[in-house]
Amino acid sequence: MPVIISNKLSKEQEEKLVVVLKEHKTALGWTIADIKGISPSTCMHRILLEDNAKPSRQPQRRLNPPMMEVVKKEVLKLLQSGMIYPISDSQWVSPTQVVPKKGGITVVENHQGEFVPTRVQSGWRVCIDYRKLNSVTRIDHFPLPFIDQMLERLSGRSYYCFLDGYSGYFQIAIAPEDQEKTTFTCPFGTFAYRRMPFGLCNAPGTFQRCMVSIFSEYIEHFIEVFMDDFTVYGDNFDACLNHLSLVLKRCVETNLVLNSENCHFMVEQGIVLRSYCVVQGY
């Protein structure tokens, strides 16, 4: 089970951490096939339209050969994992586009000698242009947390675990009656989503509401949640490890899967929402 942990841990601390991770190994995912899906009874995405909404069927957009290969690979992956399915009679059809994909946050030194967080392009991302659908969708006003308050609660802790949801949106089901509204067209056919894709205007609110529901009694006590970025913390190793165990247990119970490659366990500093979170403050 290769995972990223602090290189400052003692042998005993490493062993304790490994025991906890092995005990909750189903909370960690390696491929999209590991996503089981959060129960619709816990959370499900709805697409509610304004009363005067008129369906829109848009044509596919032209893609150059390299981008067609990107789309083909993505469509096959999503079909095989059951995230999408072919559809031919939808009243709503949106076009596909390909945009640069940003990788994880890294730290680079600028011209002033300051270390700043940045993202580098790591490939291409297939997105659906849902602007017409979004323009007639009733807006969900579920609030996101204030970042400055989150950082205040996080600063000065001894240990952190930075956790990342695996393809977070894809873990939430779309209501069956709303799936056809997510239909997209590409050179390989028309497909609709069973799980919540990027690009829907209310997806962030649905996801945040779902995470708050899952971790409600833990938030602001030993975990901070901002979309699919979760930060577990503690004032000493054993406290942080116990908090991590509780969070992973909740993940297993709710089928929430974390991206094992992007999680950092029991570290003393890191980056939260592009801000340093260190022992001395932020």
What are the roles of these predicted feature ranges?
Residues 1-282:
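Retroelement reverse transcriptase polymerase core
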